[in-house]
Amino acid sequence: MAMQKIFAREILDSRGNPTVEVDLHTAKGRFRAAVPSGASTGIYEALELRDGDKSRYLGKGVLKAVEHINKTLGPALLEKKLSVVDQEKVDKFMIELDGTENKSKFGANAILGVSLAVCKAGAAEKGVPLYRHIADLAGNHDLVLPVPAFNVINGGSHAGNKLAMQEFMILPVGASSFREAMRIGAEVYHHLKGVIKAKYGKDATNVGDEGGFAPNILENNEALELLKTAIQAAGYPDKVVIGMDVAASEFHRNGKYDLDFKSPDDPARHITGQKLGELYKSFIKNYPVVSIEDPFDQDDWATWTSFLSGVDIQIVGDDLTVTNPKRIAQAVEKKACNCLLLKVNQIGSVTESIQACKLAQSNGWGVMVSHRSGETEDTFIADLVVGLCTGQIKTGAPCRSERLAKYNQLMRIEEALGDKAVFAGRKFRNPKAK
């Protein structure tokens, strides 16, 4: 089924920054997709095209990307008469038309907007749910509901507190279904709010970009202690484990790391990667930490490799791998991590996202699907995680509509699957293992 019309516009994301939305029309109707954007971005990500006109949205407008769709990509696709079910052909055509390594001609935000809309239209054309269409594109027979990783304490570049590490997450791995995981996560979240309020006052329960709390604490183990207390208070010590996203590239300074990077710089307090690794090992020993993302800088390969060889938890590459097959292959070769963080806008098309996921899975890695800190009400990644069977998703706290949009869609998908629904649970790192 051919595309009839493609129209892009500038809308606002959850942080009040412009982003790209695309409407694609076929005989089956209108299919809409919106593109997310990140705050802590890896230097190897595909290029998000911003206008740079400081007199408008402080330079963050996306009218150039919108124009690239409306004047170039859209007309070229309509002329080519490609079918919306041919995701790979459509994506390949756009990538070749762009012709750059990092999609800098049109912008990854332009190409991805169209790619997502095409995927939604393709599902409708086949008369199947989006998650089933994505599973077909990936060659998956199975469908798996993921364990949600709720980011309930925010630090790093996502919050105005002193905390260096960016996300402290709870994973209800002991739940029996996705719906139960939502309930457990929400209950722990509310208990955490009470614990923080009692200890630091009401102001400390203000929420960050992703719906988590941002109490003004400096010590990272204090955040872990708060989680441990809230998990106990909610009555789920046997069902909930902890994950972290350190985003260490944000506080990497001249080969070392600054755990107080939001204060005036003082090289005397910078620590080595090895020392930082020892701190993580103490977290793993004292708390139920099962997953650490970006523990070191995106180019500190040697420290990643030596750390992975000494722990048996999940080590996730985000800034390290940026959903890019070349970086993933490098990380596999160097044995730097054992899980990929999958963000569709880091690579910039549905096809390449699926390829990145399959490359990681074929090397025995886990895959965690992820939102960005600047989100929209688009729910594409909820269907994506089910179709790709990755078993884990992080899309914020159980708070703020742009986060709940994804979680609520996952509850609907589980409901639609009925007794065929499979929840990853404790097998979240490799849900397909029998």
UniProtKB/Swiss-Prot annotation:
Its cofactor is Mg(2+). PROSITE patterns: ENOLASE. The active site is at residues 210, 343. Keywords: Acetylation, Cytoplasm, Glycolysis, Lyase, Magnesium, Metal-binding, Phosphoprotein. GO terms for cellular component: phosphopyruvate hydratase complex. Mg(2+) is required for catalysis and for stabilizing the dimer. The modification Phosphotyrosine is found at residue 236. Pathway: Carbohydrate degradation; glycolysis; pyruvate from D-glyceraldehyde 3-phosphate: step 4/5. The alpha/alpha homodimer is expressed in embryo and in most adult tissues. The alpha/beta heterodimer and the beta/beta homodimer are found in striated muscle, and the alpha/gamma heterodimer and the gamma/gamma homodimer in neurons. It catalyses: (2R)-2-phosphoglycerate = phosphoenolpyruvate + H2O. The modification Phosphothreonine is found at residues 72, 205, 229. Substrate binds at residues 158, 167, 293, 318, 370-373, 394. Glycolytic enzyme that catalyzes the conversion of 2-phosphoglycerate to phosphoenolpyruvate. Appears to have a function in striated muscle development and regeneration. This is Beta-enolase. It comes from Oryctolagus cuniculus.
